[in-house]
Amino acid sequence: ALPILPDGERAELIDGRMYMMAPPSRKHQRISTRLVSIIDRYIEEHKGKCEVYAAPFAVYLDERSNTYVEPDISVICDPDKLDDRGCKGAPDWIIEIVSPASKKMDYLLKLLKYRFAGVKEYWIVDPEKNRVIVYNFTGDESVNDYTLQDFVKVGIYEDFVIDFGSMEL
């Protein structure tokens, strides 16, 4: 478990090593808020069983609790993984919004941790590079590259497409 941190401080624990988290920028928060709203609306309209959570939301990727992360957005479809502390096990879909301080973590370390933990789909939204990278870890596994003006298909749903161009980012 994480040590007690001062108010306002956030950290993640990956393989027993603590990584401090920088506060998100206004643009980061705008992207996160819009995406959570779009995802939540889709789930409600389709009476889905999945739930969407924005950071700070605890995800314990392994039983040993030496990996604790706070993805920017987590979608969990198995209610048995949820308790008052957060999510135990891999969410179905994770979105990380890249900031200069989180670049290495999001593109390398978390990519591998999420894949091997059993996350089905992982999106990296990089406002600085104007791109959305979609990793689908199910079946044949694929990776697709989009811009922040594109329509992006959500892999865990049959008919869900997010129009980044209409989000006025």
Residues of each region from the PLM?
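Gly/Pro/Ser/Thr-rich low-complexity, intrinsically disordered segments predominantly at protein N-termini
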Residues: A1-L169
